[in-house]
Amino acid sequence: MINLILLGLPGAGKGTASERIVDKYHLTHISTGDMFREAMANKTKVGLEAKSYIDKGNLVPDEVTARLVEERLSQPDIKEGYILDGFPRTTVQAELLEGITKRLKKPLTNVIALEVDEDTLIKRLSARYMCKNCGATYNKISKQPKVEGTCDRCGSHEFYQREDDKPEVVKNRLEVNEKMNAPLKDFYQKKGLLTIINGEQTPEKVFEDIDAVLSNNQ
């Protein structure tokens, strides 16, 4: 079984790598953003608690997020393993996750960090745009829709660029994320779980390197 966290700054290629990992290894992709939306829509106890913070414009406390993650990891669809997206973001959350995975007997097997030079990230992020309807992500450099002007996922013709993907905002965003990412990498390095992959390579080569690491777990 493979239980995985994929680390990397915005623009490092985590989304593309995640899709390929899920396709090959049939892991359950767990996104904290999706979990919050689902739990709030279903009005679960944790979902309503999270909503009370979000509605006031406050950050959801780590303990609430951790309960949501534990609830999701307890579901029966996680048979062949999971890939966590958006959690943990801090070492405090990493410690909470460690407790959860021990209780559920679903320990992490791998933490993979995609390393990309800051200049490359700025270039990639500034070229990123999204479908207004479904949120599918595209890139003017590396990932255009199959049919120009038409979203591959939903067929919409409306696209936009997020405010925080605009060049003037990107640099500051990367610095903030790196401050959060660096301690996490240290945390998992000490646990012997971390593998660093060169994210400057083509998506195919990045996945080839990830695949070489994960195939050792089977």
Swiss-Prot record:
<dbReference type="GO" id="GO:0005737">
    <property type="term" value="C:cytoplasm"/>
</dbReference>
<dbReference type="GO" id="GO:0005524">
    <property type="term" value="F:ATP binding"/>
</dbReference>
<feature type="binding site">
    <location>
        <position position="37"/>
    </location>
    <ligand>
        <name>AMP</name>
    </ligand>
</feature>
<keyword id="KW-0418">Kinase</keyword>
<comment type="pathway">
    <text>Purine metabolism; AMP biosynthesis via salvage pathway; AMP from ADP: step 1/1.</text>
</comment>
<dbReference type="GO" id="GO:0004017">
    <property type="term" value="F:adenylate kinase activity"/>
</dbReference>
<dbReference type="Pfam" id="PF05191">
    <property type="entry name" value="ADK_lid"/>
</dbReference>
<feature type="binding site">
    <location>
        <begin position="137"/>
        <end position="138"/>
    </location>
    <ligand>
        <name>ATP</name>
    </ligand>
</feature>
<dbReference type="GO" id="GO:0008270">
    <property type="term" value="F:zinc ion binding"/>
</dbReference>
<feature type="binding site">
    <location>
        <position position="151"/>
    </location>
    <ligand>
        <name>Zn(2+)</name>
    </ligand>
</feature>
<dbReference type="InterPro" id="IPR007862">
    <property type="entry name" value="Adenylate_kinase_lid-dom"/>
</dbReference>
<feature type="binding site">
    <location>
        <begin position="11"/>
        <end position="16"/>
    </location>
    <ligand>
        <name>ATP</name>
    </ligand>
</feature>
<comment type="subunit">
    <text>Monomer.</text>
</comment>
<feature type="binding site">
    <location>
        <position position="93"/>
    </location>
    <ligand>
        <name>AMP</name>
    </ligand>
</feature>
<keyword id="KW-0545">Nucleotide biosynthesis</keyword>
<keyword id="KW-0479">Metal-binding</keyword>
<feature type="binding site">
    <location>
        <position position="201"/>
    </location>
    <ligand>
        <name>ATP</name>
    </ligand>
</feature>
<protein>
    <recommendedName>
        <fullName>Adenylate kinase</fullName>
        <ecNumber>2.7.4.3</ecNumber>
    </recommendedName>
</protein>
<keyword id="KW-0862">Zinc</keyword>
<feature type="binding site">
    <location>
        <position position="32"/>
    </location>
    <ligand>
        <name>AMP</name>
    </ligand>
</feature>
<feature type="binding site">
    <location>
        <position position="154"/>
    </location>
    <ligand>
        <name>Zn(2+)</name>
    </ligand>
</feature>
<feature type="binding site">
    <location>
        <begin position="58"/>
        <end position="60"/>
    </location>
    <ligand>
        <name>AMP</name>
    </ligand>
</feature>
<feature type="region of interest" description="LID">
    <location>
        <begin position="127"/>
        <end position="165"/>
    </location>
</feature>
<feature type="binding site">
    <location>
        <position position="173"/>
    </location>
    <ligand>
        <name>AMP</name>
    </ligand>
</feature>
<feature type="binding site">
    <location>
        <position position="131"/>
    </location>
    <ligand>
        <name>Zn(2+)</name>
    </ligand>
</feature>
<comment type="function">
    <text>Catalyzes the reversible transfer of the terminal phosphate group between ATP and AMP. Plays an important role in cellular energy homeostasis and in adenine nucleotide metabolism.</text>
</comment>
<feature type="region of interest" description="NMP">
    <location>
        <begin position="31"/>
        <end position="60"/>
    </location>
</feature>
<dbReference type="GO" id="GO:0044209">
    <property type="term" value="P:AMP salvage"/>
</dbReference>
<dbReference type="InterPro" id="IPR006259">
    <property type="entry name" value="Adenyl_kin_sub"/>
</dbReference>
<keyword id="KW-0808">Transferase</keyword>
<keyword id="KW-0547">Nucleotide-binding</keyword>
<feature type="binding site">
    <location>
        <begin position="86"/>
        <end position="89"/>
    </location>
    <ligand>
        <name>AMP</name>
    </ligand>
</feature>
<dbReference type="Pfam" id="PF00406">
    <property type="entry name" value="ADK"/>
</dbReference>
<keyword id="KW-0963">Cytoplasm</keyword>
<dbReference type="InterPro" id="IPR033690">
    <property type="entry name" value="Adenylat_kinase_CS"/>
</dbReference>
<feature type="binding site">
    <location>
        <position position="128"/>
    </location>
    <ligand>
        <name>ATP</name>
    </ligand>
</feature>
<keyword id="KW-0067">ATP-binding</keyword>
<feature type="binding site">
    <location>
        <position position="162"/>
    </location>
    <ligand>
        <name>AMP</name>
    </ligand>
</feature>
<dbReference type="InterPro" id="IPR027417">
    <property type="entry name" value="P-loop_NTPase"/>
</dbReference>
<dbReference type="InterPro" id="IPR000850">
    <property type="entry name" value="Adenylat/UMP-CMP_kin"/>
</dbReference>
<feature type="binding site">
    <location>
        <position position="134"/>
    </location>
    <ligand>
        <name>Zn(2+)</name>
    </ligand>
</feature>
<comment type="similarity">
    <text>Belongs to the adenylate kinase family.</text>
</comment>
